[in-house]
């Protein structure tokens, strides 16, 4: 779809990144009240409703192949978000995003297998080592492992998203995927007990979270992808760990040490470098 605001593509991507990270900051603010699993369930569930209204997918027209991939796509989407929220309930958002980013970064690099790409692998390993739980910074090991697991689900989401984009329209795929994401993570939200305490204020915050983390960035990114080369888009997305750290600092007063900032920088440079030196089509 074309953005009615006619935002130029590069600012649109930057706004989308900021929107997602502001959403993550709002989400973390809800953790003390309803918990990470319930927050993820609330966000994904409301996102599914919003996107279903916006794109009105016709479930009766899906064939067996579409059902197969959209279910797997939805499960990876839901688990990626829930595991990430569980991670940032234990470690700072900026570090959680940095560690999660390793998943798609490694996927992109090893899909190429060129010598120069191993430089980016090494740099990303340095970034992980700088914030590893066995270092002197005392990070929560379960938070680190959950962030890395979220990265695995993110890589799966990218692979499945690429396949499903060839057999379904983008908006329809995401809307149906969100429905299955809700199915897979809603039980965790219910069993955690967090959803039992929902009230109008929390529902409004949940709706804002769904808009900031799903509807707004999805719309902006779809419009930008039609105008930007894939490489440029990937380089811009490399800013995400830094943007996450900035949003967490502004909204949650989460401060990173110099070592942790260096770790974020290593992953940002590795991701940008991988995108810049990538071979591939511009469309």
What kind of feature is each model-predicted range?
Residues 42, 97-99, 160-182, 214-250:
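Helix-helix packing/entry segments at the starts of transmembrane helices
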Residues 26, 33-79, 107, 123, ...:
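Transmembrane alpha-helices of multi-pass small-molecule transport proteins
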Residues 2-3, 44, 202, 238-283:
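C-terminal-most transmembrane helix of multi-pass membrane proteins
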Residues 1-18, 48-72, 113-119, 136-142, ...:
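Membrane-interface interhelical linkers
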Residues 1-38, 72-75, 79-83, 126, ...:
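Glycine-/small-residue-enriched transmembrane alpha-helix faces in small-molecule transporters
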Residues 64, 97-100, 110-131, 137-144, ...:
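Loop-to-transmembrane alpha-helix entry segments
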Residues 30, 39, 43, 87, ...:
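Hydrophobic/aromatic residues within transmembrane alpha-helices
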Residues 38-41, 45, 85-115, 150, ...:
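Specific alpha-helical transmembrane segments that line the substrate/conduction pathway
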């Amino acid at each position: 779809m074309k953005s009615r605001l006619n935002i130029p593509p590069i600012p649109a991507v930057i706004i989308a990144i900021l929107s997602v990270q502001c959403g993550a900051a709002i989400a973390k603010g809800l953790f003390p009240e309803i918990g990470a699993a319930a927050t993820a369930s609330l966000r994904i569930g409301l996102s599914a409703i919003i996107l279903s209204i916006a794109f009105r997918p016709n479930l009766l027209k899906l064939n067996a192949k579409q059902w197969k991939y959209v279910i797997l796509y939805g499960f990876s989407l839901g688990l990626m978000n829930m595991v990430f929220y569980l991670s940032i309930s234990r470690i700072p958002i900026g570090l959680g995003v940095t560690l999660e980013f390793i998943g798609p970064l490694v996927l992109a690099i090893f899909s190429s297998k060129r010598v120069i790409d191993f430089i980016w692998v090494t740099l990303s390993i340095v970034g992980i080592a700088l914030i590893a739980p066995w270092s002197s910074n005392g990070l929560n090991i379960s938070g680190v492992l959950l962030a890395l697991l979220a990265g695995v689900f993110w890589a799966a989401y990218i692979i499945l998203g690429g396949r499903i984009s060839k057999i379904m329209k983008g908006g329809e795929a995401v809307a149906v995927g969100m429905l299955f994401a809700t199915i897979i993570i809603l039980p965790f939200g219910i069993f955690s007990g967090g959803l039992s305490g929902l009230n109008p204020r929390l529902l409004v915050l949940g709706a804002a979270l769904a808009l900031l983390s799903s509807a707004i960035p999805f719309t902006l990114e779809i419009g930008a992808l039609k105008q930007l080369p894939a490489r440029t888009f990937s380089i811009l997305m490399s800013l995400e760990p830094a943007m996450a750290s900035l949003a967490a600092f502004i909204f949650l007063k989460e401060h990173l040490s110099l070592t942790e900032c260096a770790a974020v920088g290593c992953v940002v440079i590795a991701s940008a470098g991988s995108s810049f030196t990538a071979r591939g089509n511009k469309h």
